[in-house]
């Protein structure tokens, strides 16, 4: 399978991108990774879609992580505005006039910000993978799920939030347990690209989001896009897992505000259903993309 790697100049730094598959008449799919700061790595499980569907897939590392520049000495760069500009620059750099756009977790937030605030042209369809339209609802739902943890783990998380001490061993153990339950269970063996150690991303995550998934106190703390979703008029597919950080309530809230959208719920999956049920996810994407080219 053909893979092209490159770097794009951006704001005096460099953005790494990876293109999978040969050029064809089909509209390419651009993938926006989560975090902020998670890097493209886990998206490599979707490489097979390029071959199966004869469609180019483009993924990249957002500024602050992976193989892109990591200007952690300038955390003021880690904002939604920077990352939207980077996406726009990548489209121009690679001449991506028409695309399908998939965003996972924070990547879905980035896609919604891009769609609602910048009104881009040439987006054939939108795939919102385990994402959110409201930071406050997300936090509320995750705190509800924390109540299902053992009492001592609940107490450790509560204590960390009260004291802002997120280095306490009891908190770290409780948070790891929570994330293994609802993000992805890292005690299991996954494809190499999922297990691969990430470069950077911590400063970007803590600056933009916060110390963990359920305490959004970074510059995205006021991310509230539910009431803006009506601006999106293109075909939209929402995907999530039954055990996801993106709870069914979070996913249904988005669907209710996106006219004509579809929602695919993956049974027994957490925050990365495309990793846990790759073949099923790829087939769903193939059908969706072919329908909306």
UniProtKB/Swiss-Prot annotation:
Leader sequence residues: none
Positions of transmembrane segments: none
GO biological process, one term: proteolysis
Protein keywords: Aminopeptidase, Hydrolase, Protease
Catalysed conversion reaction: Release of N-terminal proline from a peptide
InterPro entries: AB_hydrolase_1, AB_hydrolase_fold, AB_hydrolase_sf, Peptidase_S33, Pro_imino_pep
Highest taxon above the source species: Bacteria
MF term (GO), any: aminopeptidase activity
Pfam family, any one: Abhydrolase_1
UniProt-annotated catalytic positions: 105, 244, 271
Domain AB hydrolase-1: 28-277
Compartment(s) of residence: Cell envelope
Any single Gene Ontology cellular-component annotation: membrane
EC number(s) reported in the record: 3.4.11.5
Primary location group: other
Family to which this protein belongs: Belongs to the peptidase S33 family.
The protein's role, per its UniProt record: Releases the N-terminal proline from various substrates.
Name this polypeptide is given: Proline iminopeptidase
Underlying gene: pip
């Amino acid at each position: 399978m053909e893979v092209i790697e490159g770097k794009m100049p951006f704001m005096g730094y460099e953005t790494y991108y990876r293109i999978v598959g040969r050029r064809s008449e089909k509209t390419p799919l651009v993938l926006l990774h989560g975090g902020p700061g998670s890097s493209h790595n886990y998206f490599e499980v979707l490489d097979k879609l390029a071959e199966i569907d004869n469609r180019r897939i483009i993924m990249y590392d957002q500024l602050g992580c992976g193989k892109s520049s990591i200007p952690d000495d300038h955390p003021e760069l880690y904002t939604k505005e920077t990352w939207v500009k980077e996406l726009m620059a990548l489209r121009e750099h690679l001449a991506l006039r028409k695309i399908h756009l998939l965003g996972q977790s924070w990547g879905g937030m980035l896609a919604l910000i891009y769609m609602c605030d910048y009104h881009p042209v040439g987006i054939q369809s939108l795939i919102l993978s385990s994402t959110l339209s409201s930071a406050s609802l997300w936090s509320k739902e995750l705190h509800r799920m924390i109540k299902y943890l053992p009492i001592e783990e609940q107490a450790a998380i509560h204590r960390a939030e009260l004291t802002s001490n997120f280095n306490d061993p009891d908190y770290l153990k409780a948070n790891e347990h929570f994330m293994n339950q609802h993000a992805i269970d890292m005690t299991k063996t996954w494809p190499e690209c999922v297990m691969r150690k990430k470069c950077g991303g911590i400063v970007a995550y803590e600056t933009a989001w916060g110390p963990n998934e359920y305490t959004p106190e970074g510059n995205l703390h006021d991310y509230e896009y539910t009431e803006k979703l009506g601006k999106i008029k293109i075909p939209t597919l929402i995907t999530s897992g039954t055990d996801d950080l993106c709870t069914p309530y979070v996913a249904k809230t988005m669907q209710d505000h996106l006219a004509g959208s579809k929602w695919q719920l993956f049974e027994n999956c957490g925050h990365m259903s495309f990793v846990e049920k790759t073949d099923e996810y790829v087939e769903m994407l193939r059908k969706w993309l072919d329908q909306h080219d």
